[in-house]
Swiss-Prot record:
This is Melanocyte-stimulating hormone receptor. Belongs to the G-protein coupled receptor 1 family. The keyword rRNA-binding does not apply. GO terms for cellular component: plasma membrane. The gene is MC1R. InterPro entries: GPCR_Rhodpsn (IPR000276), GPCR_Rhodpsn_7TM (IPR017452), Melcrt_ACTH_rcpt (IPR001671), MSH_rcpt (IPR000761). Keywords: Cell membrane, G-protein coupled receptor, Glycoprotein, Lipoprotein, Membrane, Palmitate, Receptor, Transducer, Transmembrane, Transmembrane helix. The lineage of its organism: Eukaryota, Metazoa, Chordata, Craniata, Vertebrata. Residues 1-37, 94-118, 184-191, 267-279 are extracellular. It comes from Ovibos moschatus. SUPFAM superfamilies: Family A G protein-coupled receptor-like. The chain crosses the membrane at residues 38-63, 73-93, 119-140, 164-183, 192-211, 241-266, 280-300. Residues 64-72, 141-163, 212-240, 301-317 are cytoplasmic. Glycans are attached at N29. It is found in: Cell membrane. It holds the Pfam family 7tm_1.
Amino acid sequence: MPALGSQRRLLGSLNCTPPATLPLTLAPNRTGPQCLEVSIPNGLFLSLGLVSLVENVLVVAAIAKNRNLHSPMYYFVCCLAMSDLLVSVSNVLETAVMLLLEAGVLATQAAVVQQLDNVIDVLICSSMVSSLCFLGAIAVDRYISIFYALRYHSVVTLPRAWRIIAAIWVASILTSVLSITYYNHTVVLLCLVGFFIAMLALMAVLYVHMLARACRHARGIARLQKRQRPIHQGFGLKGAATLTILLGVFFLCWGPFFLHLSLIVLCPQHPTCGCIFKNFNLFLALIICNAIVDPLIYAFRSQELRKTLQEVLQCSW
């Protein structure tokens, strides 16, 4: 972990070395004095990780407690919370180890630190991939519930949902192991970036289509009730605002990290790209922020889940 100096080693193998197929090396010292580097203290990383940890533990506990929430939709939300939980645990673990090493409290061999770092890298990478997958699964689930409402319960069954969940976790673990093992190959970085773009496109297409369907439905209701046009416009604006927040948070939190991976392939020695490389810690912090925001968007908006959450908190006291 300390090998990168000022940069953390979360997914450090994807950050410190360019692909083997490229004869170039990252040159952060050539970025010049005009680079803007945002410093993220370890204490802030630890705080963000703990907040995310508490939030997502509460989501998992609430869904596990309430049998009314034992449905495919909430299982996908629960798995998203578990993915974000792994992001938080990885962050807290790495930050704690880094602080102990810097303070001289923890003394260990470099080989042990490297092995621990590899484990954390696999954990964080698998949690990132699974988080993106479950965000896509939630979008598909909502799409089916709107466009195939009468067939929803025959299409999205519990056994089928469990198979999808198991496949996502297995694929995420295998992907993370392969990514960390073959981090110095261009194709690995390109596959990760392509996966992010595919998930972003999938979510954008599905949610935009759902918004268009909802607006048409609102127009139909307005015509039946002989309502005026401003009511429909208000619904459309509310839906557009929700869609903007949902996709905007996803893009702002995940986009910079995958831009970083893209630039490692495209311009590892360019001074401007070097400036972006210096903010690797900021990009990781944004991903942790996404783990904080996800429960607010996908879980806490459910009245049933909020009610169960209150019961969980009351029991804990």
